[in-house]
């Protein structure tokens, strides 16, 4: 599932991990 838009970094849709943006390869914290 994707995280809410408020948790998304640089407009990327994130995968299962809440700390990893799979599409862009950017780590971030909500």
UniProtKB/Swiss-Prot annotation:
Keywords: Antibiotic, Antimicrobial, Disulfide bond, Secreted. It is found in: Secreted. It comes from the Eukaryota. Disulfide bonds join 2-7, 12-24, 13-30, 14-21. One of its GO terms (cellular component) is extracellular region. One of its GO terms (biological process) is defense response to bacterium. The keyword Cell inner membrane does not apply. Sillucin is an antimicrobial agent produced by the thermophilic fungus Rhizomucor pusillus in liquid culture; it is effective against Gram-positive bacteria at the level of RNA metabolism. This is Sillucin. It comes from Rhizomucor pusillus.
